[in-house]
Amino acid sequence: MEAKFAHIILFFLLAFSFETLMARKESDGPEVIKLLKEFESDSRCKGKQFWPELIGVPALYAKGIIEKENPSITNIPILLNGSPVTKDFRCDRVRLFVNILGDVVQIPRVT
């Protein structure tokens, strides 16, 4: 019984300390920000399109920031990182991909 409990504790400790390879940080370099700005200038949607500064923040806080900075965004689903999504593009949607702690792990963008 104690061994099972120890395995469960170990699993949760590892799960909470796991950071996905998809997570991007500003420390990844200016090339990431540069690519985002280039894509943003070609966009057909109005308002801010990317929020790289929201990496690592809680999803509900990020959702509030996105709604405040671009009122045309009306659909902000919160999804576990790696969840399957459709490939259609909508100017009113930003998907927030989160880890098991609920922190944003991918750059939120209009999709």
From Swiss-Prot:
Residues 1-23 form the signal peptide. InterPro entries: Prot_inh_pot1, Prot_inh_pot1_sf. PANTHER family: PROTEIN, PUTATIVE, EXPRESSED-RELATED (PTHR33091), WOUND-INDUCED PROTEINASE INHIBITOR 1 (PTHR33091:SF65). Keywords: Protease inhibitor, Secreted, Serine protease inhibitor, Signal. One of its GO terms (molecular function) is serine-type endopeptidase inhibitor activity. Its main location: secreted. GO terms for cellular component: extracellular region. It comes from the Eukaryota. The record marks 87-88 as: Reactive bond. PROSITE patterns: POTATO_INHIBITOR. GO terms for biological process: response to wounding. This is Wound-induced proteinase inhibitor 1. The keyword Acyltransferase does not apply. Residues 24-36 form a propeptide. Gene3D superfamilies: Trypsin Inhibitor V, subunit A. It is found in: Secreted. It comes from Solanum peruvianum. SUPFAM superfamilies: CI-2 family of serine protease inhibitors. Belongs to the protease inhibitor I13 (potato type I serine protease inhibitor) family.
